[in-house]
Amino acid sequence: CGQCSKVCPYTAIISRKRPCENACKIKAITMNENKAAAIDNNTCISCGACVYQCPFGAITDKSYILNVIDMIKKSGDNEKYHVYAVIAPSISSQFTYAKLGQVVTGLHRLGFYSVAEAALGADMVADAESRELVEKGFLTSSCCPGFVSYIEKAFPELKPYISHNLSPMATIARYLKEHDATAKVVFIGPCTAKKGEAAKQEVRPYVDAAMTFEELQALFDSREIDITALEEGMLDEASYFGRIFARCGGLAEAVAQGIKEHGHTHFELKAT
């Protein structure tokens, strides 16, 4: 009757194609001679789609959670050095059961010295990219490491047009280290590709570790921290335009605002 094929979440009744293979839009995952899924690292952009779509947990990204715990413990309550948490703007949509200020307080309870918004780095990047766009006329963003990797691997002819600016994560981390010689920076966001970005030569001096929101929740759970019971901490450094980077079209809006503030009224922004 076909009812089983309709309800099987893995399409196992009518197809042997793995969920991870279906999830990979750039076709970096194929079946090897043993019918096992294999990832072509020359094509993979580390977007994490396969990780989230695999129902069996067979694919995992590298975790730095133990490195972060070790970093905090060895800081001696931030006496030897200061451990900063840089949080992505999308954190407000991840911890929907609590207020952002409560998450900030929770981060302090975990042992972080201070919490900074990646959105503040986004403000800096939007300002710089708006200038660069007007100068060059055509530009692709350097904010998303997965997108940058995709251009480099699939469209190498566009590589010269990638913005020369660091991402918001790296930009705010560099700012923190320029103003605090003892700073160690941990980025916390939704994207597994950020872990690969943190390991890049041009980013490594600024970002010491990167974690996902799921790993942050694991840290809260391990310390039995109920963030809904905490007071709200303050976090108000970034602008509206820096915070909307996380939504579709947010980067274009922020760059458009930067162009406007710099007085380039003659320049017409055509975002695609």
PLM regions with names:
Residues 55, 60-272:
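Iron-sulfur-associated redox domains of electron-transfer enzymes in respiratory
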Residues 2-45, 49-65:
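Iron-sulfur cluster-binding cysteine motifs and their immediate structural context
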